[in-house]
Amino acid sequence: MTAIPVKKKVQVSFVIRDEKEPMHRSGVNCLQYDAQTGRLFSGGSDTIIRIWKSPDRKDDSGSSYSVGGKTRVRRDLHLQSMEHHTDWVNDIVLCCGVISASSDTTVKVWNAQKGFCMSTLRTHRDYVRALAYARDVEMVASGGFDQLIYLWDIATLTKLTALNNTVTTSSLTGNKDSIYSLATNPSGTVVISGSTEKVLRVFDPRACQKLMKLRGHTDNVKAVVVNRDGTQCISASSDGTIKLWSIGQQCCISSLKCHSESVWALQVDSNFSCVYSGGRDKRIFRTAINDFKTAQLMFIEDAPVQRLQLIDSESRFIWTATWNSSIKRWPLPSDAQISVEIKSDQYGETIPSIHEPDLTIPGAASIRQHVVLNDKRHIVTKDTDDNVAMWDVLKGRKVCDHGKRPMEEVIKDHFKKVFVPSWFTVDLKSGMLQITLDESDFFSAWVSAKDAGFPNIQNDTKINYGGMLLRALFEHWSRSFSDVDEESPTHRFNSVPGHTPLILCESTGRPIFRLMIRDAAHETESQMLSDFVPPWVLDVVERNQLPKFNKMPFFLLPHLSLGIKTPKKDRLSATEMLQVRKVMEHVYEKILNVNDASYSENGIPSAAQMLSPSLQANIEERVELYCQDQKLDPEMDLRTVKHFIWKQGGDLMLYYKPIR
């Protein structure tokens, strides 16, 4: 018997952002420098790879201003952004172009000159954390949380395209835990991995064989570098130590604990004569490899250090990437200028050799807090600069800025006593708002046209937020249904900005396809959407079909003040979107107006006694409706009454009282 493959659940996500994002929005995870072009490459938690000019120390051209003396802040260095990842960019290497590794589980090959993704490798099944490049043999190794290392031939990768990206790869197996670091020498004779297993594993990539394990660390190995001939390596660990190893002797030659916390980043010079280290304690140390007992404190960053990039040329620099969104360049003194003597201030703190960077590439603030308002359409956020803003999910854009105003005040000012079910989720991992729509609850947000802010539409018209948003996200797609009348629940009252990234992904977050929504009009993207768009999206976008309203049972009883001993208890069922006004009309027409007598059989005054049988618009002047002894607003819907007033399980109990 052949098993029927289970079709994976597909979600739809989009990111609310500016059209151009020239600055990193969150922490910077990786750096690479191209000495031939003088360009710096950076990858960040905001999913974007950026390319920067790296000016010479004497180059004062461009827009810059000073901070704290000699530091120049340059806002004119951004050259290009490369976007196609959907999660953190964890590592990049420069070869024929750029190869990147991401927490979206993919490895991507880029044309750096034109700035586009040539192909996507989906071999890894979990976060891809590290890359290593063997320059002389044109090989790249990738490792991640799936405990596997894959070897890639660069010549093969450069021939791949977005539609033809099938490639054969070899793998190195044996790791028992998530891989956080990788290193290889230029000739590709060894590949070394560090992981949460607390050991270094050494492989021969030519034969795809394990060679040895190097034991000694007591925590995760976060960084590894290896010398040119593959005989020595240096590792950095969350245990706070850096260790020098002999691969031939399979032992630790020396260990140094100059850092007070985890060590995350290493860089060695071209001669493998000194190593620079940085980590959680924000301090960058320089250690001579032939004297692995002492380290000089070079400088102190203002946030934990994630990556270092040494520029080992005539003008020596080191670039730093931290938890902050800015990137800094620190000028390095010559070896002769570095004092072996450790100097301390009056409090006993070690004085760094370099007091400030000479150049800063500024970053932008990232969103760190959010609250979805109870209208389930607007979101209030606070960023790392304490700026508060409000966003409209339906329009995919910012509504207004509130500056440094307390977030709680803004939320209170925009509170509405209306209940709308949750129909999307919010993720801030990129420092920007990412909205995810799931089949299970996406269609649950039915609201009246009035509550949705469309006063010109008939009050009885019901709007489906999910359907409206889907139509806006896919409006450029050729298969999108366009003949929608004004009172349709998915009528396109607004459009989402064309630059908005749209992502189809599995429920695990693993991406299937990413594009800018305006590009859905292009033939290639349109065809790929046809291959990947799930049926629940097609129902709305292509066929304009929506699920029916949810039904809500409730009881109607005469108010206790009427003194009826054996009241009739009517159990009714209606859409949860039904307004209280409609229930009042039902009471007036069907329950109170039973005959023309002065009093009906149950002792309640008949409607005919009060006024003519024809129902007037002001029903609130004829009937009152109560729940939990609270008089109900005729404009409320049953869903809101149950959420804000009934506040318990079981069927809703409503009590009517005629106005005498």
Swiss-Prot record:
Alphabetical GO biological process terms: double-strand break repair via homologous recombination
Give residue ranges of the WD repeats.
23-78, 84-120, 123-162, 174-213, 216-255, 258-297, 300-341, 362-401
User: Which Gene3D superfamilies has this protein been placed in?
Assistant: YVTN repeat-like/Quinoprotein amine dehydrogenase
Q: Which UniProt keywords apply?
A: Repeat, Ubl conjugation pathway, WD repeat
GO molecular function terms noted in the UniProt entry = ubiquitin binding
Q: Which PROSITE patterns match?
A: WD_REPEATS_1, WD_REPEATS_2, WD_REPEATS_REGION
Q: What does this protein do?
A: Regulator of deubiquitinating complexes. Activates deubiquitination by increasing the catalytic turnover without increasing the affinity of deubiquitinating enzymes for the substrate.
| Family indicated by similarity | Belongs to the WD repeat WDR48 family.
Protein name (record) = WD repeat-containing protein 48 homolog
Provenance organism: Brugia malayi
